[in-house]
Amino acid sequence: MDFERYNARETEPKWRDKWERSATFKTDNDDPRPKYYVLEMFPYPSGRIHMGHVRNYTMGDVIARYKRARGFSVLHPMGWDAFGMPAENAAMQNKSHPAAWTYANIEAMRAQLKSMGLSLDWSREIATCDPAYYRHQQKMFLDFLAAGLVDRKKSKVNWDPVDHTVLANEQVIDGRGWRSGALVEQRELTQWFFKITDYAEDLLRSLDGLTRWPEKVRLMQANWIGRSEGLLVRFALEPTLSAPATEIEVYTTRPDTLFGAKFLAIAADHPIAADCAKADPALAAFIAECRLRGTSVAAIETAEKKGVDTGLRVRHPFDENWLLPVYVANFVLMDYGTGAIFGCPAHDQRDLDFANAYGLGATPVILPPDADPKTFVIADKAYDGDGLLFHSRFLDGMTVEAAQEEVARRLEEHPLGNRPQAKRQVNFRLRDWGISRQRYWGCPIPIIHCPEHGAVPVPAKDLPVELPPDVSFDEPGNPLDRHPTWKHVNCPICAAPSLRETDTMDTFVDSSWYFARFTQPWMEDAPTDPSAIAKWLPVDQYIGGVEHAILHLLYARFFTRAMQATGHAGEIREPFAGLFTQGMVVHETYRSEAGDWMFPADVRIEIGPAGRRAFDLASGAEVSIGGIEKMSKSKRNTVDPDEIIGTFGADTARWFVLSDSPPERDVIWTEEGVQGAAKFVQRLWRLIGELIFLSGADGAPKPQSISPQAAAIRRAAHQSLIRLEEDLDRLRFNRAVAQAHDLANKLGAAVGDIDSVEIAPDLRFAFREAAEILTLMIAPMMPHLAEECWARLGHKGLAAEAPWPQADHSLVVEETIDLPVQVNGKKRGDLIIDRAAGREAIEAAALALEPVKRALEGRPVKKIIIVPQRIVNVVA
């Protein structure tokens, strides 16, 4: 049997055209079937998709196609996270407009995504830079503002003095702006905030209900929210003529360690620090130095611990004669707690590093189990474990928990001034979400600043506030600030000359509700349609990288709650019922003799006695092979999806990214692996052809009786189908691929066993059934090949519209079972016996096994334990 090779270049575009012309994947909101909403995190339109996109969107597409075949009405949309800084950078470099660059990239990437054969409903396509999208975002901003969920206040930011813009913590590298290289300054700017902290407790507690989220993501969010129960302690300042206050408030989660206190430290931007700096040039210089560092927790934690003694002293809460020095320290954050801490060096490594640097000492107050109180000291490593209190007066001998309670009780009862010296308090690490960005290419904040009425909302009838197209990027900073007319407007209340808000929204806002807009993207008079929200949300399966575990996912959870509170989300509070975080696509790195990174396409790999060696295709020079790393432009270890699809076809690329490793782990891209996937495509094509040839044009009717050979074929097909269903239901894509491989191997062997020209009807039926099952099994993963095979089988309709095959579970029940047999808990042999055998038959057969007889050595049997269809244990 000779068959023409499968030609992906000709076949794949043909089927994509048929899907598009027949609107196969267009979803009707009125479809009465049960719903299933699958969504991959939408891409930024950078201009090219990468192999990470291929893997991410292939996984989502497999789920969408599988659920559609199982009878669900599937919503599987696509859009573009289209605002952001790269477009402005491109505008500066290319003297173009961000909109032109963005929309050109969208066109290019849409064509690339379509070439993958994704079952997307393109009629719902959205771009966040489209005024038709962001007008609704502006409306929700105003609704949030009216509901008290938006605030305007001053905040510390990373300021790039060259680019004249605020930088995110991630954009500050070694204290410098990532693009300009300028030393970053800390500035205090007035900014807009979403009050996500109003939902801190709810966001934390609701994590327990997200049972279809990875545990690591829930833990990351819980840690980011950072709920802590502690004590707000008021330390009385020792009165002096220059003392700027009477007390310093400290929030602590470890009041049990108060007797180990050696100092108080306040943040550089604490009000008391500012007052002290007025008369202390050295302190003023130190505060200025602190403002030149990044504001991220990571930057502060890794920096050398430095401080300046203010000269102020506070009294210990339990001993007014015990004075503690007050330092301004570079590791204390003003926006956590009160901006002041007490340092217990013996039991906090950060405090110990600081104390050792300034000779403040360390007195341990928690005694580890089995430690000797007479000899236990702290040198360079703080003790942060459990134990009993010592060196702590009335707390000595108590557990940590009991000591915390006792300190809280005493200080709550002890007055300082006319108030208790301490009170219990719950704190959160989570901070309100600052959304102001000094950028042009973002959603304008719909506010007008009036000299009389302050910040005034833009009337709803005047939305959207659109970006002016006539801007220049010849100078650094925000072009909206320099625009001669756009920002000048009259106040909606009093008509006085006023100014528009020139900050735009953080692009995380755009991606915090797009999943809701997809449910009814044609809605013009409101952001969402209540009936569509009720039908489709929450998203049943959301797919994306774990790098978005905190910010994007947490912001989307907050936004859904805010939408619900303002009437835009019905009763929905959680946006994503199921979350899957896929691994990355990684590749070897290559470097030339000159040390330059090289693209894999420019390298030839040879395998010889000395192992794998790489050579430059152009010069023939040997190239050094580096480590396997995430594909990145900087190290040039990227593979162009267009080249792979153009050479091998989309199905080959899809098959490889699904097959190589568990989906939550990284997949190593190798040329050998891709070629192996391409060979399997050809093998499947030949196998389906052989099965069709052997079964005849129409197969044969289901026979009344069936031969063992035909029964084995049917059993293999239905068993693989059942296992593949289980794997796809659990998102085990690599194991689903393995099931298809396994069935192909078994069917190939069965075809090879045929040695007669005349094929019995039962075999023809079995071959035909197996061919159809195998075709529909691969359809979610290799949809183009499946369509061609489906048509080859004589079907007039599309495989994409065919119902999922019904597995016959009765076929996969073996007539015999294999039972391990133990003697006194140690396995001695295996018993193959009829599945329907009774207890007496199993006991007799087990005792008749020669290994069991030898193990018993003539000893009498006390009892025989039988776990039905699992195991037999003979006790002697």
Swiss-Prot record:
The organism of origin for this protein: Methylocella silvestris (strain DSM 15510 / CIP 108128 / LMG 27833 / NCIMB 13906 / BL2)
GO molecular function terms listed in the Swiss-Prot or TrEMBL record: aminoacyl-tRNA deacylase activity; ATP binding; leucine-tRNA ligase activity
First-tier enzyme category under EC: ligase
Localization, UniProt: Cytoplasm
Highest taxon above the source species: Bacteria
Residue positions of motif 'KMSKS' region: 630-634
Gene assigned in the entry: leuS
Matching SUPFAM superfamilies: Anticodon-binding domain of a subclass of class I aminoacyl-tRNA synthetases, Nucleotidylyl transferase, ValRS/IleRS/LeuRS editing domain
Keywords on record: Aminoacyl-tRNA synthetase, ATP-binding, Cytoplasm, Ligase, Nucleotide-binding, Protein biosynthesis
Residues annotated for ATP binding in this entry: K633
Keyword hit for Aminoacyl-tRNA synthetase: yes
Any one GO cellular component localisation term in the record: cytosol
Residue interval(s) of motif 'HIGH' region: 43-53
Gene3D superfamilies: 2.20.28.290, 3.10.20.590, HUPs (3.40.50.620), Isoleucyl-tRNA Synthetase, Domain 1 (1.10.730.10), Valyl/Leucyl/Isoleucyl-tRNA synthetase, editing domain (3.90.740.10)
Any matching Pfam family: Anticodon_1
Reaction(s) this enzyme catalyzes, per UniProt: tRNA(Leu) + L-leucine + ATP = L-leucyl-tRNA(Leu) + AMP + diphosphate
Family designation: Belongs to the class-I aminoacyl-tRNA synthetase family.
GO biological process: leucyl-tRNA aminoacylation
InterPro entries assigned to the protein according to its UniProt record, in alphabetical order: aa-tRNA-synth_I_CS, aa-tRNA-synth_Ia, Leu-tRNA-ligase, Leu_tRNA-synth_edit, M/V/L/I-tRNA-synth_anticd-bd, Methionyl/Leucyl_tRNA_Synth, Rossmann-like_a/b/a_fold, tRNAsynth_Ia_anticodon-bd
EC numbers on record: 6.1.1.4
Protein name: Leucine--tRNA ligase
